[in-house]
């Protein structure tokens, strides 16, 4: 489809402004913290100085956490775009039609039951996949309409939210806290290994969004 020159210019300015904001926030994240670091030393350590006194703080703690935050946001945006394109509704996203809640149910159940946290990513993926299949089946009536799918998804989302609440009320508080922390999300412990994983996910979701 064709886009007018004025809209193209706005998109260019929007992308440029976003990149500038990301760079500024990235630099601020490297400098500011419980242990403030001079801007020149922080930038040098992040880009080329691997033997300085700030190497561990910058390259093992702050830098990977910032990059993980950026990539996670990009993955969320890509997943939202995919859903909106598939359902042809600009208001739809994984959190609205219950996919996020489906992922959270199994993950929260594992945490609350004291299960192995190594299974969390797989449990969340399985929960999201099963929820998507359930929503699709419940929406089927001589085909699937976008409106019916959205309405069913909203209902399933509410139901799964109630299940999560039940789990958090039923189990001991120390386990529930871990589940609540997982739902809220945290950058604590983020590493370059997480960056590689998110890059793979981003490449996949970006390719799917383009299609």
Placement of each model-derived feature along the sequence:
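A short, hydrophobic C-terminal helix/tail in secreted or cell-surface proteins
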Residues: 207-211
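Alpha-helical transmembrane segments in inner-membrane proteins
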Residues: 1-206
């Amino acid at each position: 489809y064709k886009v007018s020159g004025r809209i193209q210019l706005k998109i260019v300015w929007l992308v440029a402004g976003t990149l500038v904001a990301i760079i500024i926030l990235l630099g601020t994240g490297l400098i500011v913290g419980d242990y403030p670091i001079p801007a020149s030393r922080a930038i040098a350590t992040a880009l080329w100085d691997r033997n300085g006194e700030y190497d561990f703080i910058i390259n093992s703690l702050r830098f990977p956490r910032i990059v993980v935050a950026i990539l996670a946001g990009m993955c969320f945006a890509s997943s939202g775009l995919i859903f909106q394109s598939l359902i042809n509704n600009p208001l739809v996203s994984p959190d609205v039609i219950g996919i996020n809640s489906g992922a959270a149910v199994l993950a929260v159940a594992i945490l609350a039951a004291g299960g192995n946290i190594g299974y969390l990513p797989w449990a969340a993926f399985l929960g999201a996949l099963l929820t998507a299949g359930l929503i699709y089946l419940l929406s089927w009536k001589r085909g699937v309409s976008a409106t019916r799918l959205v309405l069913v998804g909203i209902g399933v989302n509410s139901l799964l939210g109630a299940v999560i609440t039940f789990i958090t009320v039923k189990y001991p508080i120390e386990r529930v806290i871990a589940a609540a922390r997982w739902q809220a999300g945290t950058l604590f412990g983020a590493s370059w290994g997480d960056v590689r994983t998110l890059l793979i996910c981003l490449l996949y979701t970006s390719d799917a969004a383009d299609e």
